[in-house]
């Protein structure tokens, strides 16, 4: 395809006009090309993209008088009105009776600033020297028209002062000039043929046969079209849904619970000591309300904390504080939801999971936020073992696309044994994604649970960062439209 074939009929007309004019303003280009000014400028911009023309833009600043400024060209500035009438010292009260209070108020400051007069004990005393100022000369130079600094023969400081006094206003006028480039002149010299082209074959053209013998505008297939961004689910929401589906397919029941939990269910029921650092104000959102303790469980949990209850345990010792257990908090983990579910369903089998938000007092940075999602789950049945827990978690991570999974020993107050699952990520190595273990008898015994309970709490947002290739956790919660548009729906 020749360079000329790549031009529309309007572009050809504008290029021919520019070849003759060299450069032109939009109105001259309109006149020479025979096109409307909008069509001519659209063609000029297209020629600029192709390197055949250039469009330069100049911003011209003009100034015009405000209504107040126009009034002062007739009456004189307030300070001029006062000084011309002031033949001898006069009290300010007398001036206010002769002129409007507004005029006297404005004039007083300017008379002193310009050195035309001074005020002594409430009396205006003229200095006897009040030559015409540049501001007065500039106001007179407008003559009722908008003008540039050059046309006013004014310095920028004087005009800036008049702007502050709101006697003039500034207008910005944009002017464009279109010029032909060397490449444009060379193409025009080859001879440009003006021939109407059909850009789109319509049903009317087909029916009438008017397309016969006409030239069709060629299409360039090497130009990428504008990207089309379809509607799609937020990447983070899509990953959460993927996790849900995995556990539902594995036969689990999804459970939910309130974000406000008592300290009893959030901490004490999980055999977390009442002096544990996680319960401090700097780690937990404590609320100003309290609740009633569950009568059927509170005494058993108290006994377990104080002395180990009826099992082979010594508990934490000391006196269990019931008032502390009654205090409401924003749940720091969703384990409070699963332990309540187990208390309501103490007989096997139980397979339940929860994906929901938890809250902790965290400083916001690329890897921490005070709100985050957690994937919690439990399995309670006869003959369940620690090996079953490892196999279940490995299966989950494999289904999420991680080929290598390993487990490291861990410690949590309410599970024994405990592990931390890790996955291998190219470029990062092994990454820890949560905690898991078998609930201790100190947790299950007060609720009448006799069978082993496998439990885990996995970090959802950290897993999402790995899957989405993010280094900043905050992007998951921000409305970055560009990132959302370009995020992958799936990887084939």
Curated annotation (Swiss-Prot):
Annotated Mg(2+) binding sites: 416
One GO location term (cellular component): cytoplasm
Family: Belongs to the class-II aminoacyl-tRNA synthetase family. Phe-tRNA synthetase alpha subunit type 2 subfamily.
Alphabetical list of PROSITE patterns matching this protein: AA_TRNA_LIGASE_II (PS50862)
Top-rank EC class of the record's enzyme: ligase
InterPro entries noted in UniProt: aa-tRNA-synth_II (IPR006195), aa-tRNA-synth_II/BPL/LPL (IPR045864), Phe-tRNA-synth_IIc_asu (IPR004529), Phe_tRNA_ligase_alpha_bac/arc (IPR022917), Phenylalanyl-tRNA_Synthase (IPR002319)
Name of the gene encoding the protein in the UniProt record: pheS
Subcellular location(s) per record: Cytoplasm
CDD domains per the UniProt record, alphabetical: PheRS_alpha_core
Protein name: Phenylalanine--tRNA ligase alpha subunit
Required cofactor names: Mg(2+)
Chief localization: cytoplasm
Catalytic reaction equation(s): tRNA(Phe) + L-phenylalanine + ATP = L-phenylalanyl-tRNA(Phe) + AMP + diphosphate + H(+)
